[in-house]
Regions:
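Acidic/His- and Gly-rich active-site-bordering loop/insert found
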Residues: 2-102
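Zn-dependent metallopeptidase/amidohydrolase metal-coordination segment
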Residues: 7-11, 343-358, 363, 419-477
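Midchain, well-structured core segments that form catalytic/ion-binding scaffolds
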Residues: 22, 102-105, 145-146, 152-365
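Active-site metal-coordination/substrate-binding segment of hydrolases
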Residues: 64-146, 151-162, 202, 315-318, ...
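Short, conserved charged micro-motifs
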Residues: 65-66, 269-278, 369-375
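His/Asp/Glu-rich mid-to-C-terminal helical/loop segments that flank catalytic regions of hydrolases
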Residues: 222-240, 269-272, 316-326, 332, ...
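Active-site-adjacent substrate-binding region
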Residues: 225-227, 232-248, 401-444
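Substrate-recognition/cap regions that form aromatic- and gly/pro-loop-enriched pockets
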Residues: 341-430
Length: 482
């Protein structure tokens, strides 16, 4: 079944076209050109700011001229991840999709429905001549996934609307009215490599097949973190014997839980069988700890060629640090209405080894900005104690709930009318561009919703097809009644 046979056809037609366009974060040039040409070819006012954000404005249909101007917003970039054995270039290749029951999947790569499906919905509305709506601004931001570059660089006045619907949420039936703020903390450990002491034996260990997932949405699902597993093993062995680290590589993205990783290390040859035995016990324990959330994990341990290693003190400090930097949920929201939601978390996201340095990235989130600062400082302190050079991103603010939101009221009433049940109105422990918009446009009335996505930021990303129709119907009804 092709995308064009799925319903609503006009949305899936646009999504198929979008997935032909390479659009990695920070490399959205072709998508920007496509949007500019789309707007101009439809005779619509089209504007691009200096950051690369694109807005396409469409006049109101007859009878809706006095409605408030509604902004529909999505981001044009996508997370690029693939299975290890898949040959795919995200800078040149089109995403290949297939249907499995009620789900749309990609062949060994991320699907790009985060947030390509939001873009497709906007383009389908712009392309239509039979949908009732007031004045519209369709906004497409760039580089949301890595740095929120588009939203951060957007100047006041680029968007002129009164209300905004962000189409970057992943659970149909849920209307989001607040989000977490976040920061990224990066550490650079430097050293001068040296030859391993005489009589050392080199081993390589790896873990793969973890579920991974989004470091905001999935951080409370008790999934394993490949970095923390490998660091934990290194720490245990380091406490028992002379151990020198040579390489540690895991994770690629600050906003994804690392799914696989590998280490290379050296131990005295007399200890190699001890390490093998310890590895078997250790991995059995890990499998037991995560037997529900990680049913398929693959562990490997083998010998490898001799390499240069970190000096003893540098190796020890790094391993101690990676054991000490905690990962996961630290606090749940205290407000009774939001008690289900994570408040503060940290994701140890990536470790990459170069010749004479190791770089680590961790991502902190919180719906309380003072707690975000505290968690960031806690991570920073652990890195600094281990002798690393530390940098922190500017981050992005939390989006606070507006109890007087007219748009929320309209969206809830519309959903109840269409589907005969109440939507879930909630906050989210993930960053949405709405947080940054709320700083630049303090009076902007906002909600966020979208079709159901699962396992975003991983090659298992999939889109629940029936929910696209539901979101489409819901959005059109809201536009009709504003």
């Amino acid at each position: 079944m092709s995308n064009c046979e799925l319903k609503p056809a006009r949305v899936f037609e646009q999504f198929a076209k979008i997935n032909e366009i390479p659009r990695p974060s920070k490399h959205e040039e072709r998508m920007i050109e496509y949007l500019q040409e789309f707007g101009k070819s439809h005779g619509l006012e089209t504007e691009t700011d200096e950051t690369g954000n694109v807005v396409i404005r469409k006049p109101a249909t007859k009878g809706h001229e006095n409605a408030p101007t509604l902004i529909l917003q999505s981001h044009m970039d996508m997370v690029c991840d693939k299975l290890v054995d898949v040959d795919f270039n995200f800078h040149t290749d089109a995403i290949q999709t297939y249907v499995d029951g009620e789900w749309l999947n990609a062949k060994g790569t991320t699907l790009g429905a985060d947030d390509g499906i939001g873009c497709a919905i906007e383009l389908a509305i712009l392309d239509s001549d039979d949908i009732e709506h007031g004045p519209l601004e369709c906004v497409f931001t760039r580089d949301e996934e890595t740095s929120l570059t588009g939203a951060m660089g957007m100047k006041a006045g680029f968007m002129k609307g009164d209300m905004l619907i962000n189409l970057d949420s992943e659970d149909e039936g849920q209307i989001f009215i607040s989000c977490a703020g976040g920061k990224t903390t990066s550490a650079r450990f430097t050293f001068e490599r040296e030859a391993a002491p005489e009589g050392m034996f080199f081993l390589t260990a790896s873990v793969k097949g973890l579920k991974g997932g989004h470091s905001g949405d999935d951080i409370n699902k008790k999934r394993a973190n490949a970095i923390k597993i490998l660091a934990r093993f290194l720490y245990k062995e380091q406490e028992k014997m002379d151990l020198r680290l040579a390489k540690f590589n895991s994770g690629k993205l600050h906003n994804a839980i690392p799914r696989d990783g590998s280490i290379v290390f050296a131990v005295p040859a007399s200890e190699k069988e001890t390490v093998r035995a310890d590895w078997n016990v250790f991995t059995a324990n890990i499998e037991e700890e995560f037997h529900v959330t990680e049913p398929v994990m693959e562990f490997n341990l083998g010998s490898t060629d001799d390499e240069s290693v970190l000096p003893k003190d540098a190796s020890r400090r790094f391993i101690l640090c990676m054991q000490a930097v905690d990962n996961g949920v630290f606090a749940m929201c205290q407000d009774e209405a939001l008690a289900y939601m994570v408040e503060t978390s940290n994701n140890v996201a990536s470790v990459q080894t170069a010749e004479n340095e190791i770089n680590v990235v961790a991502s902190q989130r919180s719906n309380v900005m003072s707690n975000l600062e505290n968690e960031t400082n806690t991570v920073k302190a652990a890195f600094e104690l281990a002798g690393a050079e530390v940098k922190m991103s500017d981050g992005y603010p939390a989006w606070k709930m507006n109890p007087d939101s007219k748009l929320t009221k309209v969206a809830v009433e519309s959903y109840k009318k269409l589907f005969g049940k109440d939507p879930i109105v909630k906050g989210i422990h993930a960053g949405l561009e709405c947080g940054l918009f709320s700083e630049r446009y303090p009076n902007l009335d906002m909600v966020s919703f979208g079709p159901t996505l699962r396992d975003v930021h991983t090659p298992d990303e999939r889109l629940h097809i029936p929910t696209v129709q539901m979101v489409w119907d819901h959005l059109l009804d809201i536009m009709k009644h504003l």
